[in-house]
Amino acid sequence: MNIETKYHGTVQLSQLALVSFENGLPGFEHEKQFALLPIHDSPFTILQSIQHKDVAFVMIEPFSYFPTYEIELDDATCEQLKIQKENDVALYVILTVAEPFTNTTANLQAPVVINVHERIGKQVILTNTPYKTKHRLFPETVEAK
């Protein structure tokens, strides 16, 4: 299957690259099918709609940048995504890419949870959490005078 993408042009996909989001993503409820497109030699992955090329999100697995990040999924989410054990899950967070890149932030309050075996996912909005929608990827640095 070939699709047009925002960042990679035309891409040929295997079924293994596809992930279904039963309810879409918040704000993009009509987008149900996405492809996971890793950016080679980088920690970034693109979550690309297969229906609309301009609907694409830059994501990372959060643990390299936020080593203490942890979430607990409720039973309803685990049931919806058919999660039985921890290694069923891939966890990503969506980035807001900024210029300069050092100002890029990650949305830790709404991770994208994917069952890697069933190829189904959901963006989970966490409540009662210290996480916010904008956490800097790179700590602010103070320039020496």
From Swiss-Prot:
Superkingdom of origin organism: Bacteria
Subcellular location(s) of the protein: Cytoplasm
Annotated GO biological process: bacterial-type flagellum assembly; regulation of translation
Kinase among keywords: no
Gene3D superfamilies reported in the protein's UniProt record: BH3618-like
Keywords: Bacterial flagellum biogenesis, Chaperone, Cytoplasm, Translation regulation
InterPro entries assigned: Flagellar_assembly_factor_FliW (IPR003775), Flagellar_assmbl_FliW_dom_sf (IPR024046)
Broad class of the protein's primary localization: cytoplasm
Pfam (any one): FliW
One cellular component term from this protein's GO annotations in UniProt: cytoplasm
Quaternary assembly: Interacts with translational regulator CsrA and flagellin(s).
Function: Acts as an anti-CsrA protein, binds CsrA and prevents it from repressing translation of its target genes, one of which is flagellin. Binds to flagellin and participates in the assembly of the flagellum.
Family: Belongs to the FliW family.
NCBIfam families to which the protein is assigned, alphabetical: PRK13285.1-1 (NF009793)
Classification via PANTHER family: FLAGELLAR ASSEMBLY FACTOR FLIW
Protein name per Swiss-Prot or TrEMBL: Flagellar assembly factor FliW
Species annotation: Anoxybacillus flavithermus (strain DSM 21510 / WK1)
